[in-house]
Amino acid sequence: LIEKGLKKRTAKHSGWVVYGGIMFMPHDPNQNTSQIMSEEFRITSFIINQLTNTYSDVEFPTHPEFGDLRPFLWHNYDKVGPHFRYSLRYTTYIELENDLSITEEKTSTYKNLNKSRRQEIRYGKKSGICTSRSDDIDLFINIYLETFNRQKIDLTYEPDTIRQILNSLSKAGNLLMFSSSTSDGKIGSMAAFAKDSKRSYYIFGANTSIARESQTGTMVLWDGFELLRHSGIKCVDLEGVNSPKRGYFKLSFGGELKPYYIIGIDGPE
């Protein structure tokens, strides 16, 4: 959470990564389920009390693995004081095949694709689309700007901030970028993934006008999954399926739907 210098004491999520809030350390393997739930409940309740005693306004998204909202829902239960609000969001996890000897068409990941996505992949391969690793952050930013300029819509994120995020991830060794080009070498799409010890996260994507006439938008993800699989990544979080078009496209890759929540509380004026 980030403190914001507004009239009221405010702590809100930065907005630059999808998830935030409370994260738990691995539990003692000798604890049973009841003990784990009880311990997490007490920890969450303590954090809630600390936050609400310190800040007037609080807002953050939970992680999909954070499932127990009861301490938030029961805060000031049967009292007049402020109550937490929450709204439901979704992302999708794609499990990648662990057995590297299995060709991509035989993987469980491929079998979970919907019909139209399989067709796009077949067309993309037949047309000679090639996907490769890229370290060119400046090129990504240029294509990102082109994407929004072409569509005549406001930028979702400021380019300088994106560059800073990508550079920081790259220096830490936690950035994987891919570019997909047509058979004549024209780049159509680029995708940027962050990674940690648990999974990889699709954080930014960008398309040139070439993507509208080819399958590079599909292939940069599909081929990217295969390259991620061979680099040891076992799961990909496509980070958000919360609008119709974006949701359909990402879910067509056959991932598991995962809920998470935006939690907030507004104090008295």
What are these regions (language model features)?
Residues 1-8, 63-213:
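A conserved beta-strand-loop-helix scaffold within acyl/acetyltransferase catalytic domains
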Residues 5-81, 199-255:
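Acyl-donor binding region in acyl/amide transferases
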Residues 7, 268-269:
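Alpha-helical membrane-targeting segments
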Residues 26, 64, 96-98, 265-268:
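Non-catalytic surface loops within mature trypsin-like serine protease
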Residues 60-61, 134, 158, 238, ...:
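Residue-level detector of family-conserved "landmark" positions at structurally sensitive sites
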Residues 86-91, 256-268:
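Conserved catalytic-core motifs of GNAT/GCN5-like acyltransferases
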Residues 152-157, 255-261:
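Short, structured secondary-structure boundary patches
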